[in-house]
Amino acid sequence: MKTLYTTSVTATGGRDGHVKSDNGILELDVRTPKSLGGQNDDYANPEMLFAAGYAACFDSALNLMIRKSKSAAGETKVNAKVGIGQTENGGFGLEVELDVNVPGVSLEEAQSLVEQAHQVCPYSNATRNNIDVTLKVTNN
């Protein structure tokens, strides 16, 4: 792979700590979610950050496919739901559901565009055959 961009973020304190990008743009406290034993859900957590990255990246890939196909699709929207759970071997794993809305086109065209985006999105390529990713497509 020819690297086009690299970023760097440092974490201290694990799930109950702090993350900061080298350029200082991203800097926030992270905490364990309540459902995993944390105090509350008032902070960001690793799953939330993963969901944000995947949603933004997938939406960019989708818009690239829309431009390439010269589709008449309207403004797209991607909602990423990221779950964490225990695996059979005692470790932990993630699962993702991407709810993707592609307005202004038929459902068939929307599904085709989403499948194309899923093939080029870096997050999709990184997760393929590693975690379950479910794509739910709407066109309203």
Task: For each feature predicted by the language model, list its residue ranges.
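Extended beta-strand/beta-hairpin segments
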Residues: 1-52, 59-140
